[in-house]
Amino acid sequence: MKVLVLNGPNLGRLGKREPAVYGSTTYADLVSLCEGTAKELGIDVEVRQTDHEGEMVGWLHEAADHGLPVVLNAAAWTHYSVAVRDAASQVEAPLIEVHISNVHKREEFRARSYLSDIATGVVVGLGVRGYALALRWLAEESV
């Protein structure tokens, strides 16, 4: 099984951007965590990050066209992007929404997700370990 782990705007700056909120883990560390977890689980993973909404939409179309499960941290797009929602809604394989911080303990606008109601599941506020949990669930569900 192959899984796409898709990360939205500013996640490439992990470890530099608001470490009090997102922790000191760098984006490279996140990629290593996902790749290591995938290896342990015997699945293939491709981790991507973009600051460009159209690129994210294209990746979601790719997942939809190839029946690939997705771990999606759409970051700020979670809270306002109808385009990302519409693309994500075309993914028929499981789609897990992940957020590093607990968005419900932050600014009010972050509590609204355009994705949660179309996601298979949501992992919020467990740091980067949420990605590993999402991958583990996907691997167990595919058995």
From Swiss-Prot:
Protein origin, superkingdom: Bacteria
Residues carrying the site annotation Transition state stabilizer: 17
Residues binding substrate, per UniProt: 73, 79, 86, 100-101, 110
Active-site residues, record numbering mapped to chain: 22, 99
Annotated catalysed reactions: 3-dehydroquinate = 3-dehydroshikimate + H2O
Top enzyme category: lyase
EC number of this enzyme: 4.2.1.10
Coiled coil: none
Entry-linked Pfam families: DHquinase_II
An example Gene Ontology biological process: chorismate biosynthetic process
Pathway: Metabolic intermediate biosynthesis; chorismate biosynthesis; chorismate from D-erythrose 4-phosphate and phosphoenolpyruvate: step 3/7
UniProt GO MF annotations: 3-dehydroquinate dehydratase activity
Gene3D superfamilies (alphabetical): Dehydroquinase, class II (3.40.50.9100)
Physiological role: Catalyzes a trans-dehydration via an enolate intermediate.
The name this protein goes by in its record: 3-dehydroquinate dehydratase
Natural source organism: Saccharopolyspora erythraea (strain ATCC 11635 / DSM 40517 / JCM 4748 / NBRC 13426 / NCIMB 8594 / NRRL 2338)
Name of the encoding gene: aroQ
